[in-house]
UniProtKB/Swiss-Prot annotation:
Name this protein carries in UniProt: 2,3-bisphosphoglycerate-dependent phosphoglycerate mutase 1
Record: residues binding substrate: 8-15, 21-22, 60, 87-90, 98, 114-115, 183-184
GO molecular function: phosphoglycerate mutase activity
SMART domains, sorted: PGAM
Its EC number(s): 5.4.2.11
Gene: gpmA1
Reactions that this protein is recorded to catalyse: (2R)-2-phosphoglycerate = (2R)-3-phosphoglycerate
Any one of the GO BP annotations: gluconeogenesis
Natural source organism: Lactobacillus johnsonii (strain CNCM I-12250 / La1 / NCC 533)
HAMAP family associated with the record: PGAM_GpmA
Pathway where it operates: Carbohydrate degradation; glycolysis; pyruvate from D-glyceraldehyde 3-phosphate: step 3/5
Length: 230
């Protein structure tokens, strides 16, 4: 049986300042670094060993992966970074303070933008300082692929090809896999893995730095789920 560990990145600087982050590349906070290291210690304590690691193109997830692997003496394992595991793109909300945005547009509207499965936030303009239109890490993508806004449905649609082409084949080969990514890209994976409804998935919370361990049988059916904590 194969295992998959999902870790949402540790607290970021913008989690701390209560800003919409999305595809903006912000760093871990001091607390976030400690959360990532703690995840690695828990992984080691539970004897989890990995054959392959995946993460996004964003620093907060990459560093979370590296801290966790270093603490568990597995920094050497193969690692693949992909834009498909990036956080959901929050469009024109990126960079805005969540409290200020709620005061401007109303709590209900902001809640819909954040939590609705199908509703898109306002699209970001290419000349916005928080747009990724000219970010060279996406230079090899067709320009129309780089999003201007995403909801969870769109996020799931871009995560799934990577699951089908890379993650699922690894698990079917009996490999143990670790993924360090983001609240919404991991929520999308969780929706698929656990067959969660469109309505119920919006209430799922992913704690920063908490390893979630799935055990699969040889047909990729989940036989166990465990959250690692003290």
């Amino acid at each position: 049986m194969s295992k998959l560990v999902l870790i949402r990145h540790g607290q970021s600087e913008w989690n701390l300042s209560n800003q919409f982050t999305g595809w903006v590349d912000v760093n871990l906070s001091e607390k976030g670094v400690e959360e990532a290291k703690k995840a690695g210690r828990l992984i080691k304590e539970h004897g989890l060993e990995f054959d392959q690691a995946y993460t996004s193109l964003l620093t907060r997830a990459i560093k979370t992966l590296h801290y966790a692997l270093e603490e568990s003496d597995q920094l050497w394992i193969p690692e693949t970074k992909t834009w498909r595991l990036n956080e959901r793109h929050y469009g024109a909300l990126q960079g805005l303070n969540k409290k200020d945005t709620a005061e401007k547009y109303g709590d209900e509207q902001v809640h819909i933008w954040r939590r609705s499965y199908d509703v898109l936030p306002p699209a970001i303009d290419d000349d916005n300082e928080y747009s990724q239109a000219h970010d060279r890490r996406y230079a090899n993508l067709d320009p129309h692929i780089v999003p201007k806004a995403e909801n969870l449905h769109v996020t799931l649609d871009r995560v799934m090809p990577f699951w089908e082409d890379h993650i699922a084949p690894d698990l079917l080969d009996g490999k143990n896999v670790i993924i360090a990514a983001h609240g919404n890209s991991l929520r999308a994976l969780t929706k698929y893995i656990e067959n969660i409804s469109d309505d119920d998935i919006m209430d799922l919370e992913m704690k920063t730095g908490e390893p979630v361990v799935y055990t699969f049988d040889d047909k990729l059916d989940v036989v166990n789920k465990e959250k690692l904590d003290d």
